[in-house]
Amino acid sequence: MPSGCGDDADSTGNALRRLPHVRKRIGKRKHLDIYRRLLRVFPSFVALNRLLGGLFPPELQKYRRRLFIEVRLSRRIPDCVLVFLPPDSGSRGIVYCYVIEFKTTYSDADDQSVRWHATHSLQYAEGLRQLKGALVDFDFLRLPRGGGQVWSVVPSLVFFQQKADRPSFYRAFRSGRFDLCTDSVLDYLGRRQDESVAHLLAATRRRLLRAARGKRAALPRARASAVAGGRGGGNARRGLARGRAHGPGAQTVSASGAEGSGSQGTDLLRGSRRARVRGGGAVEPAVRARRRTVAADAATTTVSSAFVVPRDRRGRSFRRPTRSL
């Protein structure tokens, strides 16, 4: 590397290191927030592409995707590596790999600010240097005699304003083509992810799964409580209706009818008692009225049956002779 390039790189790095520590901490938190959101929207190509400002062409929607965060390559540690594999697992089509560097800024970045803004231009130059080093690392993974699968590696820069949800500026540069062994490279990228970030993202993924399970489990509990409340209210209403039907206006019945009504009254009392327990004591006055009605019916029936005198067809009374044993 020429000495001038090295001096420019050192001056750029030193200038960015002189930024306030508060700004650096905010930038790190923003990076972690971007990683979490990537995990959240990764299953949906549309949401993933929207998060990155439309970086990917729509033809990649049918491709299978793999996501790697902060991969430690030999020279650089790119923030994100997104691999798009052909739709058919046995296909020998081109693999598209996006090596992405995220830059967080205090103000919105655009095509002009990355040229003239002091901080934006330094971040842009640093990102170019990092992406160039990542391409050199992929060149080291090239198969010496060919025979592998063609990878199109696309270096990309994405600028996020620190309080924004979508990028303010992105740029995809000319891709480099490499003949690589796909399975070996995917395994290499997976093993070279930063462990601390991987653990943090795994904890985030577990929290998202628990939250989703909690939402699904809360719905059956609400339905069960609603069904139980409906049953208790229905029993209470039925017990109240029965108590009103057998109030003080009930007529005197015969002895056999009194016996049946007594057993029926007992069942009604039991049902009303159960309804009172379930319904919260709303039918207590009806139960007490029903008890008094059943007792009065039994007493009236007993007195009436004691004075019944047998009569013949003409209405004359007679007594049956008793037989001695």
UniProtKB/Swiss-Prot annotation:
**Residue pairs linked by disulfide bridges in the UniProt entry:** none
Which is one Pfam family of this protein? Herpes_UL24
Provide GO CC annotations from the record: host cell Golgi apparatus; host cell nucleolus; host cell viral assembly compartment; viral tegument
GO BP annotation list: symbiont-mediated arrest of host cell cycle during G2/M transition
The record's subcellular location field reads: Virion; Host cytoplasm; Host nucleus, Host nucleolus; Host Golgi apparatus
* Domain of life of the organism encoding this protein: Viruses
The question of whether Zinc-finger is a record keyword is answered with no
Chain positions covered by the region annotation Disordered: 222-286
Keywords on this record? Answer: Host cytoplasm, Host G2/M cell cycle arrest by virus, Host Golgi apparatus, Host nucleus, Host-virus interaction, Late protein, Modulation of host cell cycle by virus, Virion
Induction description: Expressed late in the infection cycle.
Ranges annotated as biased composition (Low complexity):
247-258
Specify whether Nuclease is a keyword of the entry.
Answer: no
Q: What does this protein do?
A: May participate in nuclear egress of viral particles. Plays a role in the dispersal of several host nucleolar proteins including NCL/nucleolin and NPM1. Since deletion of host NCL/nucleolin negatively impact on nuclear egress, UL76 supposedly acts on this process through its effect on host nucleoli. Induces cell cycle arrest in host cells at the G2/M phase following by apoptosis. The mechanism involves the inhibition of host mitotic complex cyclinB/CDK1.
Q: Which family does it belong to?
A: Belongs to the herpesviridae UL24 family.
Identify this protein by name: Protein UL76
Identify the species of origin: Human cytomegalovirus (strain Merlin)
State the gene name recorded for this protein.
UL76
